[in-house]
């Protein structure tokens, strides 16, 4: 286990944002040889945005709907997460996220500058920045992948509302402990001792893989 998962006071949580488009997305499918399957598609570029938090050790998934991605929506999603999924007494969440600019600004305000208005977040959350350009190290990317495979690819949605309702129902299946996302999100660089956590003087937490 990594130091993050060995530390009984820290609960690792992977975070990421995603857009799902109402416009039909096409991927491979079974079809009779020589046929030309057709799927209707809604014109336009309407989409719905989600911010997701997955706990790999249990498969629990929590999603929020930020509307758009900026540092304010990141801060709000942190607060919604700890409100929806309160941290057990004596423990803190360790949010693991990528280097998106809106993440970095939220981190600067919450932890680097340690502004008093964000003390509620610091009391419940620490963070880890993944190495740059490494989406393969964030297992919630796999959650988005299977969501598209199971619920949006090759499917026609006549309205953004119908797409949103479909996604909300699907994500709600994983709110509690479940084997599907647990098995999906457990991977070697998370479980093995090759991953270590380091803290610098400013309190910023980084992860290195060796």
Write out the residue ranges for each language-model feature:
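Short functional hotspots at interaction and active-site rims
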Residues: 1-210
């Amino acid at each position: 286990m990594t130091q993050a998962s060995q530390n009984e006071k820290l609960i690792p949580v992977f975070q990421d944002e995603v857009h799902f488009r109402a416009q039909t997305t096409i991927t491979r499918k079974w079809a009779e040889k020589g046929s030309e399957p057709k799927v209707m598609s809604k014109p336009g570029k309407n989409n719905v945005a989600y911010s997701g938090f997955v706990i790999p050790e249990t498969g629990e998934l929590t999603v929020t709907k930020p509307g758009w991605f900026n540092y304010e929506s990141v801060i709000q999603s942190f607060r919604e997460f700890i409100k929806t999924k309160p941290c057990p007494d004596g423990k803190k969440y360790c949010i693991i996220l990528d280097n998106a600019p809106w993440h970095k600004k939220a981190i600067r305000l919450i932890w680097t500058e340690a502004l008093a208005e964000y003390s509620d977040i610091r009391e419940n959350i620490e963070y880890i920045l993944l190495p740059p350009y490494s989406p393969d190290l964030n297992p919630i990317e796999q959650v988005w992948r299977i969501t598209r495979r199971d619920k949006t690819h090759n499917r026609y949605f006549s309205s953004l509302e119908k797409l949103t309702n479909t996604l909300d129902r699907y994500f709600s299946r994983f709110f509690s402990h479940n084997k599907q996302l647990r098995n999906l999100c457990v991977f070697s660089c998370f479980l093995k001792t090759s991953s270590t956590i380091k803290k610098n003087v400013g309190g910023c937490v980084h992860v290195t893989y060796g």
